[in-house]
Protein backbone atom coordinates (compact mmCIF):
# COMPACT_ATOMS: atom_id res chain seq x y z
CA UNK A 1 0.00 0.00 0.00
CA UNK A 2 1.49 3.41 -0.93
CA UNK A 3 2.12 5.84 1.92
CA UNK A 4 3.00 9.46 2.56
CA UNK A 5 6.22 10.38 4.36
CA UNK A 6 4.47 10.93 7.69
CA UNK A 7 2.63 7.61 7.45
CA UNK A 8 5.90 5.80 6.74
CA UNK A 9 7.60 7.30 9.79
CA UNK A 10 4.74 6.41 12.11
CA UNK A 11 4.36 2.86 10.80
CA UNK A 12 8.12 2.25 11.03
CA UNK A 13 7.98 3.21 14.71
CA UNK A 14 5.05 0.94 15.53
CA UNK A 15 4.33 -2.78 15.83
CA UNK A 16 1.99 -2.80 12.85
CA UNK A 17 2.94 -3.67 9.29
CA UNK A 18 0.50 -1.23 7.76
CA UNK A 19 -1.88 1.54 8.78
CA UNK A 20 -4.17 4.09 7.20
CA UNK A 21 -5.31 7.58 8.23
CA UNK A 22 -7.74 7.25 11.12
CA UNK A 23 -6.12 4.14 12.58
CA UNK A 24 -4.86 4.40 16.15
CA UNK A 25 -1.42 2.90 16.75
CA UNK A 26 1.24 2.94 19.46
CA UNK A 27 4.34 4.82 18.33
CA UNK A 28 7.88 4.50 19.75
CA UNK A 29 9.78 7.69 20.57
CA UNK A 30 13.31 8.34 19.38
CA UNK A 31 13.43 11.40 21.62
CA UNK A 32 11.28 12.89 24.38
CA UNK A 33 11.61 16.57 25.26
CA UNK A 34 10.04 18.85 27.86
CA UNK A 35 10.69 22.29 29.30
CA UNK A 36 10.47 24.25 32.54
CA UNK A 37 6.69 24.57 32.17
CA UNK A 38 5.67 21.13 30.87
CA UNK A 39 8.39 19.04 32.52
CA UNK A 40 7.53 19.34 36.23
CA UNK A 41 3.87 18.56 35.51
CA UNK A 42 4.90 15.44 33.57
CA UNK A 43 7.19 14.34 36.42
CA UNK A 44 4.26 14.36 38.86
CA UNK A 45 2.16 12.30 36.48
CA UNK A 46 5.00 9.81 36.01
CA UNK A 47 5.31 9.43 39.78
CA UNK A 48 1.56 8.80 40.04
CA UNK A 49 2.03 5.97 37.54
CA UNK A 50 4.43 4.39 40.03
CA UNK A 51 7.34 4.68 37.59
CA UNK A 52 10.64 5.85 39.07
CA UNK A 53 13.00 5.82 36.08
CA UNK A 54 12.73 7.01 32.48
CA UNK A 55 12.64 4.38 29.75
CA UNK A 56 16.02 5.44 28.28
CA UNK A 57 18.02 8.44 29.61
CA UNK A 58 19.86 8.81 26.30
CA UNK A 59 16.55 9.58 24.58
CA UNK A 60 15.33 12.30 26.95
CA UNK A 61 16.24 16.00 26.93
CA UNK A 62 15.06 18.78 29.26
CA UNK A 63 15.33 22.49 28.42
CA UNK A 64 14.76 25.52 30.64
CA UNK A 65 13.63 28.21 28.22
CA UNK A 66 10.15 29.58 28.90
CA UNK A 67 10.97 31.59 32.03
CA UNK A 68 14.71 31.77 31.44
CA UNK A 69 16.18 33.65 33.26
CA UNK A 70 13.71 33.00 36.08
CA UNK A 71 11.31 35.93 36.44
CA UNK A 72 10.20 35.14 40.01
CA UNK A 73 10.49 32.60 42.82
CA UNK A 74 7.89 30.29 41.31
CA UNK A 75 9.62 30.06 37.92
CA UNK A 76 12.97 29.63 39.69
CA UNK A 77 11.47 26.67 41.56
CA UNK A 78 10.30 25.12 38.29
CA UNK A 79 13.79 25.36 36.84
CA UNK A 80 15.33 23.99 40.02
CA UNK A 81 12.95 21.04 39.81
CA UNK A 82 13.74 20.46 36.13
CA UNK A 83 17.49 20.37 36.78
CA UNK A 84 17.35 18.21 39.91
CA UNK A 85 15.07 15.70 38.18
CA UNK A 86 17.34 15.65 35.12
CA UNK A 87 20.40 15.04 37.31
CA UNK A 88 18.61 12.24 39.15
CA UNK A 89 17.48 10.56 35.93
CA UNK A 90 20.79 11.09 34.12
CA UNK A 91 19.16 12.90 31.19
CA UNK A 92 20.63 15.82 29.26
CA UNK A 93 19.69 19.23 30.62
CA UNK A 94 20.01 22.65 28.97
CA UNK A 95 20.14 25.39 31.59
CA UNK A 96 20.87 29.08 31.69
CA UNK A 97 23.78 30.10 29.47
CA UNK A 98 24.13 26.58 28.05
CA UNK A 99 21.48 26.32 25.39
CA UNK A 100 18.56 28.45 24.39
CA UNK A 101 15.05 27.89 23.07
CA UNK A 102 14.31 24.16 22.91
CA UNK A 103 13.40 23.84 19.24
CA UNK A 104 16.52 25.72 18.20
CA UNK A 105 19.12 24.01 20.39
CA UNK A 106 17.94 20.47 19.69
CA UNK A 107 18.25 21.12 15.96
CA UNK A 108 21.58 22.93 16.01
CA UNK A 109 23.16 20.42 18.41
CA UNK A 110 22.31 17.44 16.19
CA UNK A 111 19.67 15.78 18.34
CA UNK A 112 17.26 15.71 15.39
CA UNK A 113 17.85 13.79 12.16
CA UNK A 114 15.51 12.71 9.36
CA UNK A 115 13.28 9.74 10.07
CA UNK A 116 12.99 10.29 13.81
CA UNK A 117 9.81 10.51 15.86
CA UNK A 118 9.98 13.15 18.60
CA UNK A 119 7.43 13.64 21.38
CA UNK A 120 7.68 17.10 22.89
CA UNK A 121 5.99 18.82 25.79
CA UNK A 122 5.44 21.90 23.64
CA UNK A 123 3.04 22.56 20.78
CA UNK A 124 5.79 23.75 18.43
CA UNK A 125 7.56 20.39 18.43
CA UNK A 126 6.35 20.32 14.81
CA UNK A 127 9.46 22.45 14.07
CA UNK A 128 11.52 19.27 13.70
CA UNK A 129 9.71 18.47 10.49
CA UNK A 130 12.12 20.91 8.83
CA UNK A 131 14.64 18.06 8.92
CA UNK A 132 12.32 15.31 7.75
CA UNK A 133 11.40 14.13 11.24
CA UNK A 134 7.94 13.61 12.77
CA UNK A 135 7.70 15.96 15.74
CA UNK A 136 4.47 16.20 17.67
CA UNK A 137 3.50 18.24 20.71
CA UNK A 138 1.80 16.33 23.52
CA UNK A 139 0.20 17.24 26.83
CA UNK A 140 2.06 16.58 30.07
CA UNK A 141 0.16 13.35 30.83
CA UNK A 142 1.15 11.86 27.48
CA UNK A 143 4.71 13.13 27.96
CA UNK A 144 4.76 11.35 31.32
CA UNK A 145 3.83 8.10 29.54
CA UNK A 146 6.55 8.72 26.97
CA UNK A 147 9.13 9.29 29.72
CA UNK A 148 8.04 6.11 31.46
CA UNK A 149 7.47 3.77 28.54
CA UNK A 150 8.96 5.41 25.45
CA UNK A 151 5.78 5.38 23.40
CA UNK A 152 2.50 7.21 22.83
CA UNK A 153 -0.76 6.54 21.04
CA UNK A 154 -1.32 8.30 17.75
CA UNK A 155 -4.21 8.45 15.35
CA UNK A 156 -2.56 8.25 11.95
CA UNK A 157 -3.20 11.62 10.30
CA UNK A 158 -3.95 12.24 6.67
CA UNK A 159 -1.54 14.41 4.70
CA UNK A 160 -2.07 17.72 2.92
CA UNK A 161 0.49 18.26 0.19
CA UNK A 162 1.68 21.87 0.01
CA UNK A 163 3.62 22.55 -3.17
CA UNK A 164 5.75 25.68 -3.30
CA UNK A 165 6.38 26.65 -6.92
CA UNK A 166 8.89 29.23 -8.14
CA UNK A 167 11.35 31.05 -5.90
CA UNK A 168 10.86 33.70 -3.22
CA UNK A 169 11.74 37.30 -4.02
CA UNK A 170 13.31 40.20 -2.14
CA UNK A 171 12.35 40.61 1.52
CA UNK A 172 10.30 37.38 1.45
CA UNK A 173 11.20 34.76 4.06
CA UNK A 174 9.99 31.45 5.41
CA UNK A 175 7.50 33.24 7.67
CA UNK A 176 5.67 34.54 4.59
CA UNK A 177 5.39 31.07 3.09
CA UNK A 178 3.67 29.59 6.11
CA UNK A 179 1.44 32.64 6.55
CA UNK A 180 0.38 32.18 2.92
CA UNK A 181 -0.45 28.54 3.64
CA UNK A 182 -2.49 29.43 6.73
CA UNK A 183 -4.31 32.15 4.79
CA UNK A 184 -5.17 29.55 2.14
CA UNK A 185 -6.36 26.62 4.26
CA UNK A 186 -7.35 28.47 7.45
CA UNK A 187 -6.30 28.11 11.07
CA UNK A 188 -8.24 24.85 11.33
CA UNK A 189 -7.62 23.65 7.80
CA UNK A 190 -4.88 21.25 8.82
CA UNK A 191 -6.82 19.51 11.59
CA UNK A 192 -6.04 15.79 11.87
CA UNK A 193 -3.49 16.13 9.09
CA UNK A 194 0.20 16.65 8.37
CA UNK A 195 1.39 19.42 6.06
CA UNK A 196 3.98 18.01 3.66
CA UNK A 197 6.01 20.72 1.92
CA UNK A 198 7.27 19.87 -1.57
CA UNK A 199 8.16 21.45 -4.91
CA UNK A 200 11.05 23.44 -6.34
CA UNK A 201 10.29 26.31 -3.99
CA UNK A 202 10.54 24.05 -0.95
CA UNK A 203 13.79 22.53 -2.19
CA UNK A 204 15.32 26.00 -2.63
CA UNK A 205 14.70 27.03 0.99
CA UNK A 206 17.50 27.24 3.53
CA UNK A 207 17.22 25.14 6.66
CA UNK A 208 16.41 28.26 8.70
CA UNK A 209 13.52 29.09 6.37
CA UNK A 210 12.29 25.50 6.61
CA UNK A 211 12.33 25.75 10.40
CA UNK A 212 10.14 28.86 10.21
CA UNK A 213 7.67 27.09 7.92
CA UNK A 214 7.45 23.83 9.86
CA UNK A 215 7.21 25.67 13.18
CA UNK A 216 3.84 27.22 12.36
CA UNK A 217 2.17 24.12 10.92
CA UNK A 218 0.32 23.83 14.21
CA UNK A 219 -1.12 27.31 13.64
CA UNK A 220 -3.03 25.76 10.74
CA UNK A 221 -4.31 23.13 13.16
CA UNK A 222 -1.99 20.48 11.71
CA UNK A 223 -0.46 17.62 13.65
CA UNK A 224 2.92 18.60 12.26
CA UNK A 225 4.65 19.90 9.14
CA UNK A 226 7.38 18.05 7.29
CA UNK A 227 9.93 18.54 4.51
CA UNK A 228 11.49 15.54 2.77
CA UNK A 229 15.18 15.42 3.68
CA UNK A 230 17.55 16.39 0.87
CA UNK A 231 21.02 17.83 0.25
CA UNK A 232 20.14 21.01 2.15
CA UNK A 233 19.36 18.83 5.15
CA UNK A 234 22.54 16.81 4.70
CA UNK A 235 24.73 19.91 4.52
CA UNK A 236 23.16 21.31 7.66
CA UNK A 237 23.65 18.07 9.61
CA UNK A 238 27.24 17.61 8.48
CA UNK A 239 29.43 17.93 11.60
CA UNK A 240 26.30 18.48 13.72
CA UNK A 241 24.77 15.01 13.96
CA UNK A 242 26.75 11.82 14.49
CA UNK A 243 23.87 9.37 14.13
CA UNK A 244 23.06 7.66 10.85
CA UNK A 245 19.99 8.63 8.90
CA UNK A 246 18.43 7.71 5.60
CA UNK A 247 16.17 10.01 3.57
CA UNK A 248 12.58 8.91 3.10
CA UNK A 249 9.94 10.27 0.75
CA UNK A 250 6.27 9.81 0.04
CA UNK A 251 5.40 7.18 -2.53
CA UNK A 252 4.50 8.68 -5.93
CA UNK A 253 0.99 7.26 -5.75
CA UNK A 254 0.37 8.07 -2.08
CA UNK A 255 -3.05 9.43 -1.20
CA UNK A 256 -3.47 13.01 0.03
CA UNK A 257 -6.36 14.66 1.83
CA UNK A 258 -5.82 17.77 -0.24
CA UNK A 259 -3.24 19.44 -2.47
CA UNK A 260 -2.37 23.13 -2.21
CA UNK A 261 -0.10 25.23 -4.44
CA UNK A 262 1.62 28.44 -3.37
CA UNK A 263 3.36 30.48 -6.09
CA UNK A 264 6.49 32.00 -4.55
CA UNK A 265 7.18 34.15 -7.61
CA UNK A 266 4.15 36.30 -6.82
CA UNK A 267 4.46 36.19 -3.03
CA UNK A 268 5.25 39.44 -1.22
CA UNK A 269 5.98 40.04 2.46
CA UNK A 270 2.88 39.36 4.56
CA UNK A 271 1.51 40.42 7.92
CA UNK A 272 -0.91 38.48 10.14
CA UNK A 273 -3.05 41.15 11.78
CA UNK A 274 -4.77 40.70 15.18
CA UNK A 275 -6.05 38.38 16.46
CA UNK A 276 -5.33 35.31 14.34
CA UNK A 277 -2.41 33.85 12.36
CA UNK A 278 -4.94 33.45 9.56
CA UNK A 279 -5.80 37.16 9.37
CA UNK A 280 -3.17 37.66 6.68
CA UNK A 281 -2.68 40.64 4.38
CA UNK A 282 0.15 41.91 2.19
CA UNK A 283 2.45 44.32 4.00
CA UNK A 284 1.34 47.03 1.59
CA UNK A 285 -2.23 46.65 2.88
CA UNK A 286 -1.08 47.10 6.48
CA UNK A 287 1.05 50.14 5.69
CA UNK A 288 0.70 52.93 8.24
CA UNK A 289 -0.34 50.73 11.17
CA UNK A 290 1.29 52.31 14.23
CA UNK A 291 3.57 50.12 16.34
CA UNK A 292 4.62 50.42 20.00
CA UNK A 293 6.94 47.41 20.19
CA UNK A 294 8.96 45.23 17.84
CA UNK A 295 9.98 41.75 19.03
CA UNK A 296 12.36 39.71 16.88
CA UNK A 297 13.12 36.22 18.16
CA UNK A 298 11.30 33.02 19.22
CA UNK A 299 11.59 29.37 18.13
CA UNK A 300 10.30 30.22 14.66
CA UNK A 301 12.42 33.25 13.81
CA UNK A 302 15.34 33.79 16.15
CA UNK A 303 17.99 32.19 13.93
CA UNK A 304 21.18 33.79 12.64
CA UNK A 305 19.38 34.27 9.32
CA UNK A 306 16.69 36.33 11.05
CA UNK A 307 19.28 38.41 12.89
CA UNK A 308 21.17 39.08 9.67
CA UNK A 309 17.96 40.23 8.02
CA UNK A 310 17.24 42.47 10.99
CA UNK A 311 20.72 43.99 10.79
CA UNK A 312 20.30 44.76 7.08
CA UNK A 313 17.36 47.00 7.95
CA UNK A 314 18.75 48.53 11.15
CA UNK A 315 22.29 49.19 9.94
CA UNK A 316 22.74 52.96 9.71
CA UNK A 317 19.23 53.60 11.03
CA UNK A 318 17.71 54.33 14.42
CA UNK A 319 14.77 52.73 16.18
CA UNK A 320 11.85 55.16 16.13
CA UNK A 321 11.63 57.13 19.40
CA UNK A 322 8.11 55.84 20.07
CA UNK A 323 9.06 52.18 19.56
CA UNK A 324 10.66 49.61 21.86
CA UNK A 325 12.73 47.10 19.86
CA UNK A 326 13.63 43.79 21.52
CA UNK A 327 15.85 41.26 19.76
CA UNK A 328 16.20 37.73 21.14
CA UNK A 329 18.73 35.29 19.65
CA UNK A 330 17.19 31.83 19.89
CA UNK A 331 20.32 30.17 21.30
CA UNK A 332 23.71 30.88 22.80
CA UNK A 333 25.31 29.73 19.54
CA UNK A 334 23.20 32.16 17.53
CA UNK A 335 24.06 34.91 20.03
CA UNK A 336 27.80 34.24 19.72
CA UNK A 337 27.60 34.10 15.93
CA UNK A 338 25.78 37.43 15.93
CA UNK A 339 28.53 38.91 18.10
CA UNK A 340 31.27 37.60 15.80
CA UNK A 341 29.53 39.11 12.76
CA UNK A 342 29.08 42.48 14.44
CA UNK A 343 25.29 42.24 14.42
CA UNK A 344 24.87 42.98 18.12
CA UNK A 345 26.74 46.27 17.67
CA UNK A 346 24.32 47.16 14.87
CA UNK A 347 21.32 46.46 17.10
CA UNK A 348 22.64 48.38 20.10
CA UNK A 349 23.73 51.35 17.99
CA UNK A 350 20.25 51.46 16.47
CA UNK A 351 18.68 51.64 19.93
CA UNK A 352 17.40 48.08 20.28
CA UNK A 353 17.60 45.86 23.36
CA UNK A 354 19.27 42.46 22.97
CA UNK A 355 18.09 39.70 25.32
CA UNK A 356 19.49 36.39 26.44
CA UNK A 357 17.82 33.43 24.64
CA UNK A 358 14.34 32.90 26.09
CA UNK A 359 10.73 32.24 25.15
CA UNK A 360 10.05 35.33 27.24
CA UNK A 361 7.44 37.66 25.84
CA UNK A 362 6.33 35.32 23.05
CA UNK A 363 3.85 33.59 25.37
CA UNK A 364 3.34 36.60 27.62
CA UNK A 365 5.75 35.33 30.24
CA UNK A 366 8.20 38.17 30.83
CA UNK A 367 10.86 40.39 29.25
CA UNK A 368 8.72 42.43 26.89
CA UNK A 369 5.01 41.89 27.58
CA UNK A 370 2.48 44.41 26.31
CA UNK A 371 0.27 46.87 28.18
CA UNK A 372 -3.38 47.60 27.48
CA UNK A 373 -3.82 49.42 24.18
CA UNK A 374 -0.33 48.66 22.88
CA UNK A 375 0.42 47.06 19.53
CA UNK A 376 3.45 44.95 18.63
CA UNK A 377 4.78 43.47 15.44
CA UNK A 378 6.73 40.32 16.09
CA UNK A 379 8.41 37.37 14.39
CA UNK A 380 6.77 34.97 16.85
CA UNK A 381 4.07 32.48 15.92
CA UNK A 382 0.84 33.41 17.71
CA UNK A 383 -1.17 36.60 18.01
CA UNK A 384 -4.30 35.59 19.94
CA UNK A 385 -5.76 38.01 22.47
CA UNK A 386 -3.59 38.08 25.57
CA UNK A 387 -0.78 36.10 23.94
CA UNK A 388 1.93 38.66 24.72
CA UNK A 389 0.47 40.38 27.76
CA UNK A 390 -2.73 42.37 28.12
CA UNK A 391 -5.79 40.92 26.36
CA UNK A 392 -6.42 44.50 25.25
CA UNK A 393 -3.10 44.64 23.38
CA UNK A 394 -2.65 43.72 19.71
CA UNK A 395 -0.01 41.53 18.06
CA UNK A 396 0.91 41.38 14.38
CA UNK A 397 3.09 38.61 12.94
CA UNK A 398 5.68 39.16 10.21
CA UNK A 399 9.16 38.26 9.04
CA UNK A 400 12.31 39.91 10.43
CA UNK A 401 12.65 42.35 7.52
CA UNK A 402 9.14 43.69 8.05
CA UNK A 403 9.45 43.81 11.84
CA UNK A 404 12.78 45.66 11.68
CA UNK A 405 11.43 48.14 9.13
CA UNK A 406 8.54 48.91 11.49
CA UNK A 407 11.04 49.53 14.27
CA UNK A 408 12.65 52.27 12.17
CA UNK A 409 9.47 53.80 10.76
CA UNK A 410 7.30 53.52 13.87
CA UNK A 411 4.63 51.90 11.72
CA UNK A 412 4.27 49.00 9.34
CA UNK A 413 6.00 49.76 6.03
CA UNK A 414 7.45 47.82 3.14
CA UNK A 415 11.08 46.88 3.95
CA UNK A 416 12.12 48.28 0.56
CA UNK A 417 11.27 51.75 1.86
CA UNK A 418 14.08 51.41 4.41
CA UNK A 419 16.57 49.18 2.59
CA UNK A 420 16.74 49.12 -1.21
CA UNK A 421 17.76 45.48 -1.64
CA UNK A 422 18.64 42.67 0.80
CA UNK A 423 22.26 41.56 0.70
CA UNK A 424 21.61 37.91 1.53
Swiss-Prot record:
Pathway: Amino-acid biosynthesis; L-leucine biosynthesis; L-leucine from 3-methyl-2-oxobutanoate: step 2/4
Cofactor note: Binds 1 [4Fe-4S] cluster per subunit.
Catalytic activity line of the entry: (2R,3S)-3-isopropylmalate = (2S)-2-isopropylmalate
Cofactor entry: [4Fe-4S] cluster
Pfam families on file: Aconitase (PF00330)
GO biological process: L-leucine biosynthetic process
Signal sequence segment: none
Keywords annotated in UniProt: 4Fe-4S, Amino-acid biosynthesis, Branched-chain amino acid biosynthesis, Iron, Iron-sulfur, Leucine biosynthesis, Lyase, Metal-binding
Binding site for [4Fe-4S] cluster: 299, 359, 362
EC number: 4.2.1.33
Listed GO MF terms: 3-isopropylmalate dehydratase activity; 4 iron, 4 sulfur cluster binding; metal ion binding
Classification via InterPro entries: Acnase/IPM_dHydase_lsu_aba_1/3, Acoase/IPM_deHydtase_lsu_aba, Aconitase_4Fe-4S_dom, HAcnase/IPMdehydase_lsu_prok, Homoacnase/IPMdehydase_lsu, IPM_dehydratase_rel_enz, IPMI_cat
Cysteine disulfide links: none
Family: Belongs to the aconitase/IPM isomerase family. LeuC type 2 subfamily.
Subunit composition and interactions: Heterodimer of LeuC and LeuD.
Functional summary from the UniProt entry: Catalyzes the isomerization between 2-isopropylmalate and 3-isopropylmalate, via the formation of 2-isopropylmaleate.
Name the UniProt record assigns to this protein: 3-isopropylmalate dehydratase large subunit 2
Organism per entry: Rubrobacter xylanophilus (strain DSM 9941 / JCM 11954 / NBRC 16129 / PRD-1)
Amino acid sequence: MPHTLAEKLLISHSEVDDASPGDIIMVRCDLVMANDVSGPVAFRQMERMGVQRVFDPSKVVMVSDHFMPAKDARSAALQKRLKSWSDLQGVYYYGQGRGGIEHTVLVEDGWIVPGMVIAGGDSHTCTYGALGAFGTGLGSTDIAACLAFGEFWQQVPGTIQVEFTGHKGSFVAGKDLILAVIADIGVGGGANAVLEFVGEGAASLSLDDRLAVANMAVEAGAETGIFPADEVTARYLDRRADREWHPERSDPDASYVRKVKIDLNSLEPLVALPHSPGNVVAVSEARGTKIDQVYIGNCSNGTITDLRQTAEILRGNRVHPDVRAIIVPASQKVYRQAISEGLIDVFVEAGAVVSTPTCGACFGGHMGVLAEGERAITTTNRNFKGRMGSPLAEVCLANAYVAAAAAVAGEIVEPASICSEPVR
